[in-house]
Amino acid sequence: MCAASVYPVSPEAAKHSLTDEAAYRAMYQQSVINPEGFWREQAARLDWIRPFSEVKRTSFDDHHVDIKWFADGTLNVSANCLDRHLAERGDQVAIIWEGDDPSEHREITYRELYQEVCKFANALRGQDVHRGDVVTIYMPMIPEAAVAMLACARIGAIHSVVFGGFSPEALAGRIIDGSSKVVITADQGIRGGKTIALKENVDEALTNPQTRCVQKIIVVRRTGANIRWYPHRDVSYDDLMRVAGEVCAPKEMGAEEPLFILYTSGSTGKPKGVLHTCGGYLLYAALTHERVFDYRPGDIYWCTADIGWITGHSYLIYGPLANGATTLMYEGVPNYPDVTRIARIIDKHRVNILYTAPTAIRAMMAEGPAAMEGADGSSLRLLGTVGEPINPEAWHWYYETVGRSRCPIVDTWWQTETGGILISPLPGATALKPGSATRPLFGVVPGLVDNLGNLLEGPAEGNLVILDSWPGQMRTIYGDHDRFVDTYFKTFRGMYFTGDGARRDEDGYYWITGRVDDVLNVSGHRMGTAEIESALVAHAKVAEAAAVGVPHPLKGQAIYVYVTLVAGTEPSDTLRQELQQWVRHEIGPIAVPDTIQWAPGLPKTRSGKIMRRLLRKIATDDYDTLGDTSTLADPGVVDQLIAAHEAVKQR
């Protein structure tokens, strides 16, 4: 193995972990040579109502993309996360909830969670929610959000969780796309000492006439604030729970019936409703949670992700609960009330496993030793990172300062579409290289291809594809299977195209190099450039806009936007701020451009295509490698943009 900055597996980790190097190699070989046999064996970790006869029926042929796992088997996801644990661990804590305010926390046992879920499942049925209906969940990070997800799964409703930071317009778009019957929300959310007007946002979203599909809003009281109330439509969560029956038999669901829709940004503007199903998704989330995090009974496991993202679905709720784990849910932000909050939570709850994003790590790192000041940290055994590639400097700081140079780091690569982690170290099996996601997990066959789709052998750099299906894979884009095929299977025929670029080194380790399509990764959140551009162009004073990502020390990428104004409109700092507020209103705070540069025009080919490559280079001061600009309709615009960029830097 190449010796540059390699951290070998410690003898202790190899001895005590679930998977050592020999076990990894044997399991991986079986999983790719005999996937049917491997996944049949693994599926025994779930409780099936009707056992399946066929394991795998999948095709990546772009004329007939079809993904089915355990298709004739039946089960219930909620029962697998709750009911089956009651006999042995009913009194074990399932969810530790830590409030935004450090003085607030709750512990909910498996039995208590089961009771709450049964009652709320009955309450949903009382609101005419049934199998196959879509329920939108727009909530803060409170236990009731987990209850809502599991209650939907119990009765066969499809949940669609929308991140609480999204604007009313973005929320409305997701409600309309899924034809949601019910919206579950809270009066307000609390993050970093500030309140978020969730109910007010829902009210505003439902002023869109296309949201008439919504029959009821169920409102959880989080702050007790005065909110507008519409008696014909709004229902109190507490009132429903007060009268709900306590017994709710789990619905027998086909393995391929939908479990949830989760919207993710695409390169074409309209967010994609990624659809995951019951059987394969839960199995993959449970297996990867156990093996990647080397989960052992009794561990306190903390995934810092919001439930509005796939990481919150798979590794805060479904994976841990399917494995009978104790999962910690945190309402707030990493630096509130001060930078020691993460360290304090680790010590307060004796956290053993921490799974967080490079953005949070870089924010702590920026504070220097203060972030871990006075912390004990001795309970930690394993660290994880997710959302974007972690730069080696942040990796080293995380390893040395948070993990005290004794906790392995699992740098995980995966996507909303994959349902679970695809490439990651295993603590007892994989020597670590800072910045590398290392090797594929069981059943995952990655490849690198050039732009013509030719597979590259050995050490190489190219487009990252997956050559065969795995159980956690998304099945379709909700209501738009053609878009699913076009997005993931048409670029490179017979392969799943991830949209990411990667490098494979001489040891077979994978290094993710970032998106190769027009998608940004801001603080670990994917965002389509087209979505931001569409929002800006909807403003009366904007003629054209182009968004690119530029490196940012904390967020990974910052949003840099070139804006061409309507003729006769004068650029000004006031207008710049107005446009930033406009994007905040249209999409949400996470999409607000960090920099807006006024542009006399955009570099376009004669066919009208914007040359984003040039815009990225100008935004990062890379003027020397602009390459041939003679194919542009107006080559002179490049010099104008460079001059304008220099002016932006002087501001």
UniProtKB/Swiss-Prot annotation:
GO cellular component labels: cytosol
InterPro entries the UniProt entry points to: Ac_CoA_lig (IPR011904), ACAS_N (IPR032387), AMP-bd_C (IPR025110), AMP-bd_C_sf (IPR045851), AMP-binding_CS (IPR020845), AMP-dep_synth/lig_dom (IPR000873), ANL_N_sf (IPR042099)
Annotated positions binding CoA: 191-194, 311, 335, 523, 584
Cofactor entry: Mg(2+)
Root EC class: ligase
Entry GO MF terms: acetate-CoA ligase activity; AMP binding; ATP binding; metal ion binding
PTM field: Acetylated. Deacetylation by the SIR2-homolog deacetylase activates the enzyme.
N6-acetyllysine carried by residues: 609
Keywords: Acetylation, ATP-binding, Ligase, Magnesium, Metal-binding, Nucleotide-binding
Keyword Ubl conjugation appears in the UniProt entry: no
GO biological process, one term: acetyl-CoA biosynthetic process from acetate
Binding-site positions, Mg(2+): 537, 539, 542
Entry EC no(s): 6.2.1.1
UniProt protein name: Acetyl-coenzyme A synthetase
Gene name of the record: acsA
